[in-house]
Curated annotation (Swiss-Prot):
The keyword DNA damage does not apply. PROSITE patterns: ODR_DC_2_1 (PS00878), ODR_DC_2_2 (PS00879). Belongs to the Orn/Lys/Arg decarboxylase class-II family. SpeA subfamily. It is an enzyme of class 4 (lyase). The lineage of its organism: Bacteria, Pseudomonadati, Pseudomonadota, Gammaproteobacteria, Enterobacterales. This is Biosynthetic arginine decarboxylase.
């Protein structure tokens, strides 16, 4: 296969863009992972990794493959981008990346980040998260940001952290919070370190735009900011207000929105200084997006900028306002959780069932068949003629109308089941023929191509729960890159839609990455229906594990940690074997031991022989302590 042909095939999956150097397709057509692309080009072939485990200790699927070195490299890359921006623009303030643990609170994630040796603060958005952050914060003077709704217990935990020597910023997001903070600080005899979240007029666009702007759930209006300043003055605590925070929304796709928001928030910085508030930290919140679809555009699941441009806009925007007003450069904080974690995990699962169209030469209808059947057959015959006068669009419309007539006549008892089946199969033959004749480069054909691809797509039933593993794909139509682990050096001749194994019609992935951006079907290479491909779901490291739910009692998948050691040998260890049926039953207060006892009682009341009773009981018990997903016998 020549290089041009290989590159054309690779473009069908856009890996070069969404992969961000962490993922690529090798010459064998396998998807590979580079855990630390800046240091080494050594990679891990996911297909070969699975095959190797199959020979030694087979890994049950689905499983989440966790790459701690990618996580650590993301931390390094973000810090590096901001250092470069500060150097370029002569910015005098520091920078601190803060990890909002709500993005993924799992221990393996927090510990991997803290072990990296890079500068990192932590953010809590709830009482439970505050407990975790206090326990995990690094040495004294570690930076902690406290967001979200706060009760007195949450506030006391934060103030305890301040007493322990951490730099803990209690961000005031509701006016009702300040009274509690001042009262609890007095009880603990500690000077609180405060922040204020300003509610901006600026907002981002996309799926999360409601989390920023004037309609935001959190933040103080301009009037409330002034009221807060007066309250702190009266309490002689104005010096404690040290941090200004804003948030435009998650996954900001347009760099212009970011620049606009930074400039508006910088005006708050200036005005607060005029009021005597010596703000020293400027928290730009989240919003640093990742390119899930690889189009480098302003669409909801993409971004039209990179790390460097984002850092440049933030640092230059704040620095410029400070210089204009002769104010000190504050420490810049960003809460870039999605950009930090999205790439570091890959969900891998097997296809457990395939439904696809197979075509054989059609047979003519019986003589004197109803008109709708004869009309369908006429369309098919006309299309076989090299000089047929009907356009492809006309043939498609004619066959669609005839099929509709067939369904109507079947409903009224005019046609029987065999006639309906014959008509539906011939209609698919017509669609298949038209699909092969259409030209993807012809814009007039584009809509027909998309519609036919969706109509003719294979259905792949995948061993996973959409609601557990990709909840954002279900809830907000979030896009995730998906592709087979191998066969990617072959032309993707087929299209597929992926369905999960829950008993829910919503358990279907509706949008996929392809070379043209976003499609309703997944391009896949030829495959044996008896041996369908293993699939990888990429960039699922942010939010998905935490948001996943227990629909149909499908539990957490197994988690496998994969890294390259100093000799660049692959190290694999099981971080979590995944939930068993017993685990999930306990979540809903069903006692597995009691269920086993109930089942045993039912068996004893039957007339089954002792051997069969024992076999049934053993099977039931094995199911109780087995994986919640489908397993190979």
């Amino acid at each position: 296969m020549n290089d041009r042909h290989a590159e054309k095939i690779r473009r069908a999956y856009n890996v070069a863009y969404w992969g961000n150097d962490y993922f690529y397709i090798n010459d064998l057509g396998h998807i590979c992972v580079r855990p630390n692309p800046e240091v080494s080009q050594s990679s891990i072939d996911l297909a070969e990794l699975l095959k190797e485990k199959e020979g030694k200790n087979p890994q049950p699927l689905p499983a989440l493959f966790f790459f701690p070195q990618i996580l650590q490299h993301r931390l390094h890359a973000i810090n590096k981008a901001f250092k470069s921006a500060r150097d370029s623009f002569g910015y005098q303030g520091d920078y601190c990346l803060v990890y909002p643990i709500k993005v993924n609170q799992h221990r393996r994630v927090i510990e991997s980040l803290l072990k990296s040796g890079e500068s990192l603060g932590l953010e809590a958005g709830s009482k439970a998260e505050m407990v975790a952050v206090l326990a995990y914060a690094g040495g004294t003077r570690s930076l902690i940001v406290c967001n979200g709704y706060k009760d007195r217990e949450y506030i006391r935990l934060a103030l305890m952290g301040e007493k322990l020597g951490y730099k803990v910023y209690l961000v005031i997001e509701k006016m009702s919070e300040i009274k509690m903070v001042l009262e609890e600080a007095k009880r603990l005899n500690v000077v609180p370190r405060l922040g204020v979240r300003a509610r901006l007029a600026s907002e981002g666009s996309g799926k999360w735009q409601a989390s920023g702007g004037e309609k935001s759930k959190f933040g103080l209006s301009a009037t409330q900011v002034l009221q807060l300043v007066e309250i702190l003055k009266s309490a002689d605590c104005l010096s404690g207000l040290q941090l200004l925070h804003f948030h435009l929304g998650s996954q900001l796709s347009n760099i212009h929105d970011i620049a606009t928001g930074v400039r508006e928030s910088a005006r708050f910085y200036v005005e607060l200084h005029k009021l005597g508030v010596k703000i020293s930290c400027f928290d730009v919140g989240g919003g640093l997006g990742v390119d899930y679809e690889g189009t480098r555009s302003q669409s909801d699941c993409s971004v039209n900028y990179g790390l460097k441009e984002y850092a440049n806009n933030v640092i230059w925007g704040i620095g410029e306002i400070c210089n204009e007003n002769h104010l000190p450069h504050p420490t810049v904080i960003s809460e870039s959780g999605r950009a930090l974690t999205a790439h570091h995990t890959v969900l891998i699962s097997n296809v457990i069932g395939v439904e696809r169209n197979e075509f054989s030469p059609p047979q003519a209808p019986e003589k004197h068949s109803p008109r709708a059947l004869e009309s369908l057959w006429y369309t098919w015959q006309e299309m076989q003629k090299p000089d047929h006068r009907h356009s492809l669009r006309e043939c498609l419309h004619d066959s669609q109308r005839d099929l509709q007539d067939v369904h109507t006549q079947y409903t009224h008892g005019i046609l029987d089941l065999k006639q309906r089946a014959w008509a539906e199969q011939l209609y698919l033959q017509i669609c298949h023929h038209i699909q092969k004749e259409l030209d993807p480069s012809d814009r007039a054909h584009r809509t027909m191509i998309d519609n036919l691809q969706e109509r003719m797509a294979d259905k792949l039933y995948v061993n996973f729960s959409l609601f557990q593993s990709l909840p954002d794909a279900w809830g907000i139509n979030q896009l995730f890159p998906i592709l087979p682990l191998e066969g990617l050096n072959q032309r993707p001749e087929r299209r597929a839609v992926l369905l999960d194994i829950t008993c829910d019609s919503d358990g279907i992935i509706e949008h996929y990455v392809d070379g043209d951006g976003v499609a309703n079907t997944l391009p896949i290479p030829p495959y044996d229906a008896e041996n369908p491909p293993i699939l990888g779901f990429f960039m699922v490291g942010a939010y998905q594990e935490i948001l996943g739910n227990m629909h149909n009692l499908f539990g957490d998948t197994a988690v496998v940690e994969v890294s390259l050691d100093e000799q660049e040998k692959i190290s694999v260890k099981i971080d979590n074997p995944g939930n068993t049926v017993s685990d999930m039953l306990k979540y809903v207060k069903l006692d597995p031991k009691a269920l086993l006892a109930y089942f045993a009682q039912k068996i004893k009341k039957t007339d089954l022989n002792a051997q069969l009773q024992m076999a049934f009981l053993e099977e039931f018990e094995a199911s109780l302590y087995g994986y919640t997903y489908l397993e190979h016998d």
